[in-house]
Curated annotation (Swiss-Prot):
Cell compartments where the protein resides: Cell inner membrane
Name recorded for this polypeptide: Type II secretion system protein H
Entry similarity comment: Belongs to the GSP H family.
GO terms under biological process: protein secretion by the type II secretion system
Positions of modified residues (N-methylmethionine): 30
Pfam families per record: GspH (PF12019)
Domain of life of the source: Bacteria
Function: Component of the type II secretion system required for the energy-dependent secretion of extracellular factors such as proteases and toxins from the periplasm. Part of the pseudopilus tip complex that is critical for the recognition and binding of secretion substrates.
Main subcellular location: membrane
Propeptide, residue positions: 1-29
Species annotation: Xanthomonas campestris pv. campestris (strain ATCC 33913 / DSM 3586 / NCPPB 528 / LMG 568 / P 25)
Membrane-topology annotation of the record: Single-pass membrane protein
Length: 169
């Protein structure tokens, strides 16, 4: 048997009393809190990692390292030497298969490597051989006080990439 609930009546009024329950928060309030937490997290991450410039530096360093690894893989797969070229002044790089790219203008680029494989004085080149070995080289990327280094071993052709920590004075 079901019992019907009657609205509560105030003793001096004939109209029902409306109870307001303030037990929770609205969906809009929850979304606002989540958005504020996300914004604070993004700002904290940007401040701790060097912000946009740091992201550009890491992105450029990782892109160059990936293209160097690709060039090495192509040399091994095709059995013919392959060359990776970088132009520090123009901030451009080229890899086999038509791969090429530009580096952000804010970056300072420095190349150290064997002159024998450089076709031009102002251009750096790293050549990879069919056995995976290379002529070796180093690419340093700098923006403000942050540095990223990409090293290529001349015996193994191994590509290593990462931030370069400068000792505190």
């Amino acid at each position: 048997m079901r019992v019907a609930r009657l609205p509560l009546l105030h003793p001096h009024r004939a109209a029902p009393v409306v109870r307001r329950q303030l037990r929770g928060s609205s969906l809009l309030e929850m979304l606002l809190v989540i958005a504020l937490i996300a914004l604070a997290g993004v700002l904290a991450a940007a401040a701790l990692t060097g912000g946009i410039d740091g992201m550009r530096l890491r992105s450029a360093g990782k892109a160059i390292a990936a293209q160097l690894r690709y060039t090495r893989t192509q040399a091994i797969a095709t059995g013919t030497p392959q060359r990776f070229l970088i132009d520090p002044q123009q901030r451009r790089w080229e890899a086999p298969g038509g791969h090429h790219g530009d580096l952000p203008a804010a970056l300072e680029v420095r190349f150290t490597g064997a002159r024998q494989v450089q076709s031009r004085q102002d251009q750096g080149a790293i050549q990879f051989f069919a056995d995976g070995a290379s002529t070796g080289g180093r690419i340093d990327l700098t923006i403000k006080d942050a540095r990223w280094r990409v090293d290529v071993g001349w015996i193994t052709g191994e590509v290593r990439s990462g931030p370069l920590r400068t000792p505190a004075p």
